[in-house]
Amino acid sequence: AGRPHRIAVTDLIEQQRNLPRHITRVVVAVAHGPGVAELLEESGAVVVRTPPRGRPSTRDFVRAVTSCGAREALLLPSDADSTPVAKAAAEFLRDDDIRVAVVPSRSIVQTLAAVAVHDAASSFDDDVVTMARASSATRYGGVTVASKEAITTAGRCQVGDVLGLVDGDIVEIGADVTAVCQRVIERMSSSTSELVTLVTVLDCPPDLVPAVAAHLQSALVDLEVVAGGQPYWPVIIGVE
């Protein structure tokens, strides 16, 4: 019988990777939680940490690039609201003769996928294409809790309802985080899916990861769990 053949749990705070003062190419990524910020730093990225429901400034992106003396930069906004800011920063940096590309990423799971394939030894253009492909190949979803009554694409929700989203659209309404998470993964998965990534809060329901692992036992799909610590989202989901 099939079963998940790799379950990797990434701890929250372990160590911060120190980047050299001057590097040729830098990856700058936005992060909304301490866990994903640490993971990105350990992967070699310069992280722009943003407050809950906040977005970075143009200066944040520019400073992240110029502080390490890089002449090439890849910017990962990690959400739709930060994308225009990243594009504005890219224009500013180009005026300073820095080669810049904004790699499309609308969720932290797309950013993680892009960073995982970054290759500083490849050409700039090849690196951009590879990272963009990894990002676009990652469907993103999540589970959150309704803060007000509203009419959604999945029906009416009440305060406290658990909402499941896929690619930014509400597709599930329920009462239990784990159950809604499982249904969202079902919607996101296909016969070609290879990896499910869960980015969780610090107080993630203890049954969530075991339940998802059991849920995936019928297919040879990898499961990676990142203790992200992000606000407002009990779990963010990526499927590649």
Language-model regions, residue ranges each:
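N-terminal loops that bind phosphate or other acidic moieties
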Residues: 1-240
